[in-house]
Amino acid sequence: MELKKMNGIAVLLTAALLCSCSTKSDKPKITQNSPVPQNVLTASQDSKQTQQTVKNEEYTPLNYDEQKAVWISYIDLAGMLDDSESAFRENISKAFENVSDLGCNTVYVHVRAFGDAYYVSQYFAPSKYIPAEDGTLRYDPLKIMTDEAHKYGLSFHAWLNPLRCDTQVYMEKMQGTQIYEWYSQPGKYPEYVSKPDNSDYYWLNPAYPEVRKLIADGAAELAENYDIDGVHIDDYFYPTTEKSFDMQAFTAAQTADDLSQWRMDNCSEMVHDIYEAVKSVDKRLLFGVSPQGNMDNNYTQMYADVKKWCSEEGYLDYIAPQIYFGYENSVCPFSETLKNWENIVICKNVKLVCGLGVYKLEREDEFINDMGIIARQIGDTEADENCSGFALYSYQSLFTKTDERFLEERKEISAQLK
């Protein structure tokens, strides 16, 4: 995502997050004994689902026919995390209350952004943003987040960046993990972890089955150990179009003769493996991908074969393209772009969720000049029978802006939802 490429500013958001929350509502939290909210997909609604082997038998996933989602990024979380478990619980609970009060029912929350973990993991090192001592977490943020989200009736999708790792400084702190072994022994594991030219960040290479297995195992670990409702990845597939990034791996793949197709096949294998890993734990859990809204970019820059994933079984439950464009955009006008995505979602088991860019309200003229444009776009998705919801990027843009313009925009969004 465009805005998610920001780094290093996360710790500055704490004060903004704590002071910008909406007025506390009198709406009661949902408890274990509360009735299931309307339009919820549960096991009882699908006799096939009730016959599945479920490894996390104590939890029934909470998902909605129509997703009304908000992305909560690692940048947002860094401003909420605290040395105190109780303080973090209060901060994240307030965030979920804000999302619920707005009229939304789902959150995509970052739990792995840089080859790290916001939870207890046997595969990944703790995130640099999490309070820890000698690599041991002081508390488990993900356990707290799922508990608090469900109190407000929010479906919780664990958001991963499966391939992106970190800078050299933080890669050196991942000792004891598989990623560190690959990173520290490039002679033994050539290009398992690669760094594009003119970039400080390392990336996992999906060309290798061992890499794809690690990513899939990490998704299964989340599904089995935590009360999540889905797994979600975004548009960070290949970080570069440079041939040098993975030339050794490509050369070794003797059956491949087209670099672009080979890379797309690698990503498709990875997406399929994550899907299968999640479903192996509980077929009621959802798996979704949020690719770039510009269809061509997925093929020419990211090597993401979105048409394949939306037309064949075994890849997705939903796709949430980032249609962060205005109605008058010269390259990807909103209505036309949404229609293009509708046309490729032909697999009956894949739903379309429209990603909307709230952050554009302070970045582009059409969004700045057209008051209520996000609310209007939400209305368009709700009126479109081919859409199964929307997702708003991001929490920061929705709730940490205190100027009159953003307050009015949020008011119009809430009015549209309610």
Question: Residue spans of the language-model regions?
Answer:
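Aromatic- and acidic-residue-enriched carbohydrate-binding clefts of CAZyme catalytic domains
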Residues: 65, 115-142, 169-205, 239-261
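Active-site-adjacent "subsite" loops/lids of carbohydrate-active enzymes
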Residues: 60-89, 157-158, 163-221, 225
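Aromatic-lined substrate-binding rim segments of carbohydrate-active enzymes
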Residues: 113-161, 255-281, 334
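C-terminal motif of bacterial Sec signal peptides marking the signal peptidase cleavage site
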Residues: 18-20
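Polysaccharide-binding and catalytic clefts of secreted carbohydrate-active enzymes
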Residues: 98, 185-312, 324-325
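Substrate-binding cleft of secreted/luminal carbohydrate-active enzymes
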Residues: 313-333, 340-418
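Catalytic domains of carbohydrate-active enzymes, especially glycoside hydrolases
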Residues: 90-117, 225-230, 314-318, 387
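The substrate-binding groove and active-site-proximal loops of carbohydrate-active enzymes
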Residues: 75-86, 124-138, 198-213, 256-266, ...
